[in-house]
């Protein structure tokens, strides 16, 4: 079900169901979570029971639950994946986020489908095709700018989803095979080895060192706080936070931050609304600086910049809080700009490495000065230079606040109590129009003190503290002020609120699979390389049905034995180090974009530059021992050698 054009959806990640609940309570309009398998996050799976329990919790708030099934599938996995989709549909989830087009060829229930970021949606033509082929919502590539997003929005009727916060893959999503090439762990199957976070030395075509031992493929984290209004204007409706590996504190904090930002825009502009019900009150001040990040960038949304990389370290350094004055074997003396607390996480940068520790005890020794005893003194701390900058990447007191109840989300209800001496009628109507009416029969006496009785009735029906509701308006319309025992009134109110819970679930509008356009779409290319990630016969049939004539197998099929682009990126190291021909004065021909090399130990990667689309291709080769491994996802790869031997027929006489 496509979002209404004026609705904005804040979409939060959830490693597990507990985090999903907190994301919703902190303001998420939808959450995305991994199921028992095929979820593109190797260590972030959840049982069907956990998801089934999550769904009604979300739906009472009008919030949605999306399940990721966005790995590419081996032929041996098609049947179990199809069974899982059927099971997920029965739990009531709202949509599947998928990468593998083979899913669209399966015999599955009419569940809504969203095109994953792994589909690498960068062009109008591809976006329109996916929309016409049956996808209700599409996740655009993080590398797009506002004009490109706007063009896609105008060309398609799918809901546009865009990442607004979190870790950035340096490669186009779905176009990175370096992990599989080097380790056999496929990013397209949720098991990335994070080669992009390693240190590399950059050399030019003459072998000269341009940068030594830097994290040259490690990006800063995405932060679109300043661009939310512009993204809305460009047509984005679903604002996605990255982070299905992130912990509870991270999800609470970042969800709360963007809930407040979007609510401010909705209130300021008018004509916009959040896509779920309720108001959220936070009991802490959100700060994107206080949970994990590698520095912030808005990437390419406005224009290409040369400071998008986190070259010094892929770790979370945190905020500067002072400087180190003295280091001994047991403690540090520091001067700070903010108070410290026991349990704080502190660090300094020593020779390009982050050296950190937890503060076991801090003692104030003077104005803005502390003595800090670490839990364990890092071995290299004595190397800290005089007045080295001190950073805090874990604010213990702030984290403690997040460990407690840190938000409350309630739905506004209008309450009307009417009736007469023989019957009371209680009506509760939610802010989104869902309404229930409950009656209570009896012989109720007229109260001696009318004013006191009316006030008591108003207070009684307004006590919604143990529910997800709050009373926005209360009307008591009785011919006479009646005396109702508190116990009876409380039970009457509780039963009505429970009826409202049930009505919200009963009236929840479930989406369905979008129909293929008439006439059916034609895929914009007739030849697909291994970069299309076609890994099974159903995906191949899908593309053939829509006009593709030549289809290469996915990289995981081990058919690409030579040098190929194992990573394609919008990030360009020539640009980052002012070696781009387009930066050179005069003609573009005056400075050629010759290949360069990235070196990490024995691993040597070639960089080639495609200047027309401003892309960098990282060229590498699959290691021989990986070529000999079973294809990921195949039964052979999933079964131990001993168990595999048990499946072989026994010889006669043995």
Task: Write out the residue ranges for each language-model feature.
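Residues at the C-termini of beta-strands that transition into short coil/loop
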Residues: 117
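An active-site metal/cofactor-coordinating segment within enzyme catalytic domains
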Residues: 43-47
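Short, glycine/polar-rich helix-capping loops at beta-to-alpha or helix-loop-helix junctions
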Residues: 122-126
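Surface-exposed amphipathic alpha-helical tracts and adjacent flexible/coil segments at the periphery
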Residues: 1-26, 30-33, 37-40, 54-55, ...
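Short active-site loop/helix that positions an aromatic residue
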Residues: 102-109
